[in-house]
A protein has these predicted regions:
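Active-site bordering "gate/hinge" segments
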Residues: 7-8
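N-terminal signal peptide c-region/cleavage motif recognized by signal peptidases
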Residues: 15-17
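Cysteine-centric segments in proteins
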Residues: 19-107
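Positively charged n-region of N-terminal signal peptides that target proteins for export
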Residues: 1-4
């Protein structure tokens, strides 16, 4: 019986949804704004979202490098943004596109 309860408890933890946390965000296009921050995986990938703003997903490819996608309207598809994004040396909460120099930050 204990084993069954243990298996059920582990399954519940694995199936538990991720929860968004309040954060402060910045993008080159939208400036500073309050947002929701949600971790996407163990590598450090994350998503930021806010009403009236695009939703951004930062997918960690390797330490310090990421691919970024954006959803520009509710229910829309994620569109890959140009270039690899590098973690900023000045602020580790920020990512900067090598190609366009667009910046995305979440604190």
């Amino acid at each position: 019986m204990r084993l069954l309860l243990g298996v059920v408890a582990v399954a519940a933890m694995i199936a538990a949804p991720a929860f968004a946390k309040d954060a402060d965000c910045y993008t080159t296009d939208d400036g500073d704004y309050p947002c929701n921050f949600e971790s996407l995986d163990a590598a450090g990938s994350f998503e930021i979202s806010a009403p009236g703003k695009p939703t951004f997903q930062v997918w960690i490819d390797r330490p310090g490098e990421a691919s970024v996608g954006a959803v520009f309207e509710a229910g829309g598809r994620s569109v890959p943004l140009p270039g690899t994004y590098d973690r900023s040396e000045e602020d580790g909460a920020c990512w900067v596109s090598r190609e366009t120099e667009a910046e995305l930050c979440a604190w």
